[in-house]
């Protein structure tokens, strides 16, 4: 396979070295566990967190005479993912044996796909930024392929001082290996790519993307070169299990390689591990080539074939994906591209927002979800699934603002009460006397008192109309934030003789 460089060198992404600029080249191999109740070639459960070796069939344990039987749901999930990646779906693919020895691989080989994967070339559009001007840049990252394969078991070396244990619960679980082209040029791009890929998988419902549970892991291929030169020798960083660690591992590895090259050395092609505690990579083994695994078609499995109707049926049932949803939010709800991007970044956030925005002003709903709800969740270290404020409750606050029952300032107080205590927004406002004062007479009385008590400020405001805001603030303070701000502003300007 020839590798084509499709990116134009960008000085913004160069890494300065002691002897000049360098460019980092990054490719990603993401292992995403297929959301399926059973494994790729057996009926054993895929439930996470079970007792060791509780979910192991005779096929998973490689007992003599046991033959693999393909799980149709896993095939469908792979095709759905390929469609979500705008990729070519191959109607005929072949399962191969990848031969190597490891204690947690009972067969002595892994069933994978080598030359004929189920999904071919595709693409992902990532958004990188903001830059110093607050601008975001869209970058297209190519997908080389997606193939199905079995996961291995898990070796545990910390349970006994003299023995290692093997848990085969994960053995045979279906994985999608999604291989990018070497189109990434910075750690920020790599993090944006992984974030976007995880979002797409979650929207599709083909992988839960829970990296802390091991259901999504990344192998990161890193090399450096002088801008515009040929690709350098790459090193692979295995099994990085968080987006933050992906960024850190790339930063360290690029600097490590640059230091070696600037010192006159050469990069050894090898597999490395990322030590999160030290923030550095370390050598694991020399990098294997494909011929080291002695790939050959699995004689126990026929070629996987399906027709166009099979693909079209899955395509017709696909959910709305992040890019399409973002475009709709901008077009139909009048949201900014930035706000729409934040809201579609996670399916759960988008679903929450749409529930709040239904029948309401989209911009108002977006402001409350992004600034107030997500801000509070971030401060509390909670996810959207853990929010104590439901879409109905947040929508209730927006309704109370719209009908003039409360001001925006009082709405913040209502939100805080809902966050800490729960309840119904309208009942909270009623029981705590938080209704906005709309009686013009009462507001006018407060305005007159503030003006009478501050003659010096009156003269200043008449000379400089922008100072009228000081009077508005004083009236709001005097009324405990309950006065209608628009009514206060109109009365202040009228009393001071300031034209609108």
Curated annotation (Swiss-Prot):
Keywords assigned by UniProt, alphabetized: ATP-binding, Ligase, Nucleotide-binding, Protein biosynthesis
UniProt-recorded Gene Ontology molecular function terms: asparaginyl-tRNA synthase (glutamine-hydrolyzing) activity; ATP binding; glutaminyl-tRNA synthase (glutamine-hydrolyzing) activity
Database matches in InterPro entries: Asn/Gln-tRNA_amidoTrfase_suB/E, Asn/Gln-tRNA_Trfase_suB/E_cat, Asn/Gln_amidotransferase, Asn/Gln_tRNA_amidoTrase-B-like, GatB, GatB_C_1, GatB_Yqey_C_2, Gln-tRNA_amidoTrfase_suB_CS
Catalytic activity: L-glutamyl-tRNA(Gln) + L-glutamine + ATP + H2O = L-glutaminyl-tRNA(Gln) + L-glutamate + ADP + phosphate + H(+); L-aspartyl-tRNA(Asn) + L-glutamine + ATP + H2O = L-asparaginyl-tRNA(Asn) + L-glutamate + ADP + phosphate + 2 H(+)
SMART domains the UniProt entry points to: GatB_Yqey (SM00845)
NCBIfam families listed in its UniProt record: gatB, PRK05477.1-2, PRK05477.1-4, PRK05477.1-5
Job description of the protein: Allows the formation of correctly charged Asn-tRNA(Asn) or Gln-tRNA(Gln) through the transamidation of misacylated Asp-tRNA(Asn) or Glu-tRNA(Gln) in organisms which lack either or both of asparaginyl-tRNA or glutaminyl-tRNA synthetases. The reaction takes place in the presence of glutamine and ATP through an activated phospho-Asp-tRNA(Asn) or phospho-Glu-tRNA(Gln).
Subunit structure: Heterotrimer of A, B and C subunits.
Name of the molecule in the record: Aspartyl/glutamyl-tRNA(Asn/Gln) amidotransferase subunit B
């Amino acid at each position: 396979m020839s590798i084509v460089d499709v990116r134009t060198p960008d000085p913004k992404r160069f890494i300065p070295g002691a002897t000049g600029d360098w460019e980092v080249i990054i490719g990603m191999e993401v292992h995403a566990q297929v959301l399926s109740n059973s494994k790729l070639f057996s009926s054993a459960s895929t439930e996470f967190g079970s007792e060791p070796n509780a979910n192991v069939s005779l096929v998973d344990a490689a007992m003599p005479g046991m033959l693999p039987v393909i799980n149709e749901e896993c095939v469908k999930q792979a095709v759905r993912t390929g469609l979500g990646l705008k990729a070519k779906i191959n109607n005929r693919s072949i399962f191969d044996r990848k031969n190597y020895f490891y204690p947690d691989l009972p067969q002595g080989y892994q069933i994978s796909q080598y030359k004929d994967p189920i999904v071919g070339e595709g693409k992902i559009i990532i958004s990188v930024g903001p830059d110093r001007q607050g601008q975001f840049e869209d970058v297209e990252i190519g997908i080389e392929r997606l193939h199905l394969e079995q996961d291995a078991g898990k070796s545990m070396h910390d349970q006994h001082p003299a023995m290692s244990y093997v848990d085969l619960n994960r053995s045979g679980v279906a994985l999608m290996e999604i291989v990018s082209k070497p189109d990434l040029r910075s750690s920020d791009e790599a993090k944006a790519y992984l974030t976007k890929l995880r979002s797409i998988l979650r929207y599709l419902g083909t992988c839960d993307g829970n990296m802390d549970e091991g259901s999504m892991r990344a192998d990161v291929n890193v090399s450096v070169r002088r801008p515009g030169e040929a690709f350098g020798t790459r090193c692979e960083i295995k099994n990085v299990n968080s987006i933050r660690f992906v960024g850190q591992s790339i930063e360290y590895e690029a600097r490590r390689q640059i230091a070696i090259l600037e010192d006159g050395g050469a990069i050894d092609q090898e597999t490395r591990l990322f030590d999160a505690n030290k923030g550095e990579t370390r050598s694991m083994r020399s990098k294997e080539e494909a011929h080291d695994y002695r790939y050959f078609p699995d004689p126990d499995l026929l070629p996987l074939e399906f027709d166009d109707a099979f693909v079209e049926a899955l395509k017709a049932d696909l959910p709305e994906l992040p890019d399409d949803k973002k475009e709709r939010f901008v077009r139909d709800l009048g949201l900014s591209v930035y706000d729409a991007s934040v809201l579609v970044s996670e399916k759960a956030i988008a679903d929450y927002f749409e529930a709040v925005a239904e029948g309401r002003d989209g911009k108002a709903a977006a402001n409350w979800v992004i600034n107030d709800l997500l801000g509070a969740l971030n401060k509390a270290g909670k996810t959207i699934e853990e929010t104590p404020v439901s879409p109905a409750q947040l929508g209730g606050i927006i309704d109370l603002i719209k009908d003039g029952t409360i001001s925006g300032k009082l709405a913040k107080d209502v939100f805080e009460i809902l966050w800490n205590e729960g309840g119904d927004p309208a009942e909270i406002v009623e029981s705590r006397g938080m209704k906005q004062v709309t009686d013009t007479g009462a507001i006018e009385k407060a305005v007159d008192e503030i003006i009478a008590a501050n003659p010096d400020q009156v003269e200043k405001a008449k000379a400089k109309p922008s100072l009228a805001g000081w009077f508005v603030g004083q009236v709001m303070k005097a009324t405990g934030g309950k006065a209608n701000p628009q009514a206060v502003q109109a009365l202040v300007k009228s009393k001071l003789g300031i034209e609108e």
